[in-house]
């Protein structure tokens, strides 16, 4: 009986440790938006902040956009490749090493977390979800490009309800 008690304690300790490692001390600039993001994420995959991604050399990480094609066409993070959510497009992964660093994003992080989980199940080991996703990226003033890779101030807000979290006044919301 004592062995089972020790085993149970070890399993619980491992679970708590691995869960807390995923909950990196990330915050969005706006407290209300940060709380909204936290409410939607399960923290089932590691997260990376927009500052960290912005500072990373562009060729060092594969950036994947898990939104829908019409959202991606309006704007996306420079260097990002469309992978989709409802219309999954795994072609972008062809030839990608399983240990290549990958960052997935969507509007706030919910859809990208689901796609990141899928990638991890496929064997990709260095997958992260962009905390606050493209909304936080834009809110902090980082660049966006359109479908022709030209700079833009337009951002697809998914719908009117979710667009309220695009807080940067220089961004033109589209839905």
Role assignments for model-derived ranges:
Residues 1-4:
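Positively charged n-region of N-terminal signal peptides that target proteins for export
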Residues 6-15:
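Bacterial N-terminal signal peptides
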Residues 16-46, 73-100, 113-175:
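Rhodanese-like catalytic fold shared by cysteine-dependent sulfurtransferases
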Residues 44-51, 57:
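Alpha-helix-centered segments that form part of catalytic cores
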Residues 53, 62-67, 80:
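Short hydrophobic beta-strand that contains or immediately precedes a catalytic carboxylate
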Residues 59-61, 99-101:
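A general structural motif
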Residues 105:
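Short, surface-exposed ligand- or partner-binding patches at beta-edge/loop junctions that are enriched
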Residues 109-110:
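Residue-level detector of alpha-helix initiation sites
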